[in-house]
């Protein structure tokens, strides 16, 4: 096993091969990575079978689905890499140019961060997405996968590095930390001088640990306590469709809905219809029904467990939905502000004034009017695959694509000027 220190030194030694690579060279490397990923399908699936067998009974079925790979999912991962090829190269982009009275020409241009560390949980697709985005944005990457997905991740990284071996970019620009202990995560948090940026992708425990302990700059990809508010002027059919999609299409992802707020004027008519869609119809179709966690008012209209206070602060990542009846739009917004992780929140309403109030007052990275929160995604936003959803305001916010993985510098051109 290569030590963490050796890996940090290796990636530092070769980072210039990617930091200054041309767009053509990077695109050739990405295509080679995608081809070798597909070529290694058999090996990756064998590794994934080991991870799945080890994880069964230890994590929920929803989380097992995150971990699971088949040939179609591997092909989708390769397709995601190829889509990054089609994106414009951000490196070298001129952001601003100005000329001072003394003749100095100042150009602000986009540059690579350098080396980016990614700590993430059991999601194999993050491995290929992170490698593709960091490479296209001119960065080397150090990956630290969750233990549950390590065999799969190792097989994926092996394939990606074999692809790089056929190009002029050194394979060591992609590093996988072999130690999956907690100590390896803390070592990355303290790797100042080796990592220029650290991005955690996972649950609240992981993200909080990184934010609280890292001395390396961090972009926080926050958890998603995602709200949908059904206003008194909502179209109920739209609301049913939006909630069904936001909650059930992929409950294990961070843009999935976790909390429903319903105006009291809508509760009696809307909540029984919602129960029919999310519970009865799903049972009839052989699908897992949604389990409601209901406040006292909501429990008057539908069946479910009584909500506890923590239910409105929980990212369930499962077929569970907390439901609260509110007396006004203002109460809904106040609830969101008290419990939000500032990820994605939505209002369903036909009232333009209510929509404007909601979008102005809710302080989240993505705020929706009459649409599912599942659209908070780099691919859906036209950014290609993403590094995560930033819930902070400094440097990056919302889906992080290529530009969010870069910095800038000033190039000052003169003709012998000196400062008087």
From Swiss-Prot:
Major localization listed first in the record, in broad terms: cytoplasm
Official protein name in the record: Gamma-glutamyl phosphate reductase
NCBIfam families: PRK00197.1, proA
A UniProt-annotated Pfam family: Aldedh
Species this chain originates from: Streptococcus pneumoniae (strain JJA)
Entry's family note: Belongs to the gamma-glutamyl phosphate reductase family.
Keyword Phosphoprotein in annotation: no
Lineage, highest ranks first: Bacteria, Bacillati, Bacillota, Bacilli, Lactobacillales
Keyword Cytoplasm: yes
Signal peptide (from-to): none
């Amino acid at each position: 096993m290569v030590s963490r220190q050796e890996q940090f030194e290796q990636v530092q030694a070769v980072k210039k091969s990617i930091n200054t690579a041309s767009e053509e060279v990077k695109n050739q490397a990405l295509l080679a990575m995608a081809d070798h990923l597909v070529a290694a399908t058999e090996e990756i699936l064998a590794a994934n079978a080991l991870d799945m067998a080890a994880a069964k009974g230890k994590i929920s079925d929803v989380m097992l689905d995150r971990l699971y790979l088949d040939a179609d999912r591997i092909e989708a991962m390769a397709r995601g890499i190829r889509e990054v090829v089609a994106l414009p190269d951000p490196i070298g982009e001129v952001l601003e140019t100005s000329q001072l009275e003394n003749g100095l020409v100042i150009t602000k241009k986009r540059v690579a961060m350098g080396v980016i560390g990614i700590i993430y949980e059991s999601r194999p697709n993050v491995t290929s997405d992170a490698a593709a985005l960091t490479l296209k944005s001119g960065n080397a990457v150090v990956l630290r996968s969750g233990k549950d997905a390590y065999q799969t991740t190792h097989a994926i990284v092996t394939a990606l590095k074999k692809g790089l071996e056929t190009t002029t970019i050194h394979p060591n620009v992609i590093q996988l930390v072999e130690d999956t202990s907690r100590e390896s995560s803390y070592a990355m948090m303290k790797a100042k001088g080796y990592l220029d940026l650290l991005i955690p992708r996972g649950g609240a425990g992981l993200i909080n640990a990184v934010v609280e302990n890292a001395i390396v700059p961090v972009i926080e990809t926050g958890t998603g306590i995602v709200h949908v508010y059904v206003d008194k002027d909502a179209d109920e059919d739209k609301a049913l469709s939006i909630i069904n999609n936001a909650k059930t299409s992929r409950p294990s992802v961070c843009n999935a809905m976790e909390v429903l707020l319903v105006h009291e004027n809508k509760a009696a008519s809307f909540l029984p219809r919602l129960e029919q869609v999310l519970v009865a119809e799903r049972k009839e179709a052989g699908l897992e029904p949604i389990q409601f966690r209901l406040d006292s008012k909501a429990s008057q209209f539908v069946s479910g467990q009584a909500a506890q206070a923590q239910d409105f602060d929980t990212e369930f990542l499962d077929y569970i939905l907390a439901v609260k009846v509110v007396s006004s739009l203002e109460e809904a917004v106040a609830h969101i502000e008290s419990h939000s992780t500032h990820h994605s929140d939505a209002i369903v309403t036909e009232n333009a004034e209510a929509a404007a109030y909601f979008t102005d007052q809710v302080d989240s990275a993505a705020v929706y009017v009459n649409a599912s929160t599942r659209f908070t995604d780099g691919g859906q936003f036209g950014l290609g695959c993403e590094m995560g959803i930033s819930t902070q305001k400094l440097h990056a916010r919302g889906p992080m694509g290529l530009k969010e993985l870069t910095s800038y510098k000033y190039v000052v051109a003169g003709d012998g000027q000196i400062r008087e």
